[in-house]
């Protein structure tokens, strides 16, 4: 698993109206990103395209959360959850992520993630849950941190 370091501990704020969008191939390589995503993550679109999406993975995120995400979307189901991402400079930002498998002619061809700014109550709940999960004290079935 990729462990992106260093981290600064500084949270990057972004406008509430932003929608951070990426598309990946079936292996998780970024094939498209919008300007808002690139701006918040601190990369240019050219730097992002072709890179594995875990380029922005924050080390505080439990590996099990991403295992659940991949298991869900590979089955053709959508996934939603709170995600703490790492910026290029080590800062972080929280997103309420909705990941959807894209089908063409009945075949899974790519994934798209649309993210928006979560409520602070969602972030607090996710921080507590993920910290407990990283300590090994949260059951695998606990993933619903959205509402």
What are the functions of these language-model segments?
Residues 142-147:
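Alpha-helical transmembrane segments and their helix-membrane boundary motifs
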């Amino acid at each position: 698993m990729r462990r992106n370091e260093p981290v600064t501990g500084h949270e990057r704020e972004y406008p509430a109206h932003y929608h951070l969008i990426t598309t990946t191939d079936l292996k998780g390589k970024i094939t498209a990103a919008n300007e808002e995503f690139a701006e918040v993550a601190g990369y240019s679109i050219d730097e992002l395209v072709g890179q594995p999406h875990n380029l922005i993975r924050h080390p505080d995120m439990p590996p099990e959360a991403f295992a659940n995400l991949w298991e869900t979307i590979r089955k053709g189901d959508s996934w939603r959850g709170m995600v703490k991402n790492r910026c290029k400079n080590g800062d972080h930002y929280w997103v309420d992520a909705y990941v959807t498998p894209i089908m063409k002619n009945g075949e899974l061809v790519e994934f798209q993630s649309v993210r928006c700014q979560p409520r602070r109550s969602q972030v607090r709940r996710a921080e507590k849950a993920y910290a407990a999960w990283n300590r090994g004290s949260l059951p695998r079935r606990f993933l619903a941190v959205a509402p």
